[in-house]
Amino acid sequence: MEDVEARFAHLLLPIRDLTRNWEVDVAAQLGEYLEELDQICISFDKGKTTMNFIEAALLIQGSACVYSKKVEYLYSLVYQALDFISGKKQAKQLSSTPEDGTIGDASSRAPQEAEQKFRALDDLSDSCANVDLRDDQVVSGTLIPLLPNALVAPDEMEKNSNPLYSCQGEVLASRKDFRVNTCTPHPRGTFLLEPLGVSLMEALQPWNPKEPGRAEEQPMEVSVCGSPGPALSTSQEPGSSPEGPVPRGGGVGEDEEDAEGAAEPPEASAPEVPMEPPEPRSPEQSVAQPRRYTLRERKEAPEPASRLKDTPDPWQGLDPFDSPDSKPFRKGRPYSVPPRVEEAPGQKRKRKGAVKLQDFHQWYLAAYADHTDSRRSRRKGPSFADMEVLYWKHVKEQLETLRKMQRREAAERWLPRAEQGLWPVEEDRLEDSVEDLGAADDFLEPEEYAEPEGAEPGEDADMEAEAMPASLRYEELVQRNVELFVTASKQDVFVTTSRQELVQETELKQHIRGWEDAIQSLLQEQEEHVPFDIHTYGDQVVSRFSQLNQWCPFAKLVAGQPAFEVCRSMLASLQLANDYTVEITQQPGLEAAVDTMSLRLLTHQRARQRFQTYAAPSTVQP
């Protein structure tokens, strides 16, 4: 066994050296380090100020809480201000637009605002007989109403339960985002946040006789003449009943006179007087007042059960398997274009006849325009797709023909057409188009192709013809016009582009442009700097010391250098202090220690040189 160990001793030696290097009691060293940290006390100003990390942490936490509360309070104040502004605007809009639609002056608007500010609660049907009110009762606290469930923001799980997808598969919204799914619908069409407010809203809603929906609920009576009118009741004297005996007489003639008097409209008998709430009066005053007619209040008649059954529920779900009601067949009116107005697309292979197609405009004016003959009924205009396509197709052709005619008239003033014989084929086309346009003067609007007012046709062409010599040939004339056109187009494009740039140049873009200019200059300056090598700058700092163990201020070492060079020298000095090449010191005190850094050179040997010549214990020969 000893021979085997001696044989492989050179292989076991590196492993033993490696295990010897790792035989370190980490737990003991960590315990000693924690004990030293527990005994260390950080103080400033020669022990006057002691650093307590627990108090500092609590102070930072409290400051963060205070500032967060301030931010939340400011957030709520902003929302309150927005609600106040929106409510003020709504109040102004309501006060400026009365019910009758007329806009009054400021003097008449003030009492309306005062009336609309508070709602009268005298028309509530609840009895208040058993309620005792105490003046000296102390209010225990302010009751905050709960937020309705419809206004509570849903969580992420509720939002993702039934999402609404688009055609491309994107999530557009959730089911809770629509009020129709979170609120309770009222029969009048209002969405209520809670169903508890239905009866209260009906009780608070005033009765308006002008409302069209309540017209049929007003009690009506039929007079003798057969015309319906509102039910009237007479104010009787005290002690007399409305169902008392009929007064004297009672003949047929008197009844007819009473019927004629009742049939007269109220406007003819007495002027209109605005209704006012009755005031409490004494019996003597009521006896002295003459008898007057007033509207008698009647209870609303309940709707018959048959009408309630016939009215469908708009919110009731439909049965997908229910057979729909059969609707009667309605015969439609066919529309067709005459065969001689447009060529049929399916007759290419057939032999065409010698029949000439009828002009579309002549047929259209004869069929749909106004007729002088009143005995012939006027047809309706084009109302189907094929007719619309054909109509606008011919309109575009006519407009294009008119533009060609105007250009030709302008060119005829300085181009002799008869001598040079230009455009022989187009002449025939224009002549045919002019003949067709003769019957369609009222078919096209002249404003679409007319020249601006104050400018005679061909005025620009006359000026150009006067400036041109008579010896120019047609080719030279065309080249000159093309060059002028290209030059003018370039100028127009340049002017348009510059205008668009000026319009789009906003204040934000100006700030961005200034920031880009500043950043570009800084980046260019950074690119010109020499690459940073901490060892090179460390050698420069060491070379500035004249001898060992001599204190030298850092400001003296970096005097006259730019800011980025000072920063690099500072980093190199810290690295030298970490390698125990130099020693750093400063004056005591917080404020007094500013800019008092001094260095002392300990050795000329570099730490990187020691690492370069370092050899592991295992590699060293014993």
From Swiss-Prot:
Gene Ontology molecular-function annotations: chromatin binding
Compositional bias (Low complexity): 262-273
Any Pfam family: CNDH2_N
The organism's place on the tree of life at top rank: Eukaryota
Listed name of the protein: Condensin-2 complex subunit H2
Modified residues (Phosphothreonine): T19
Residues with Phosphoserine modification: S95, S199, S223, S227, S282
Region of interest called Disordered, as start-end residue ranges on this chain: 207-354
UniProt record similarity statement: Belongs to the CND2 H2 (condensin-2 subunit 2) family.
Assembly information from the UniProt record: Component of the condensin-2 complex, which contains the SMC2 and SMC4 heterodimer, and three non SMC subunits, NCAPG2, NCAPH2 and NCAPD3 that probably regulate the complex.
Provenance organism: Bos taurus (Bovine)
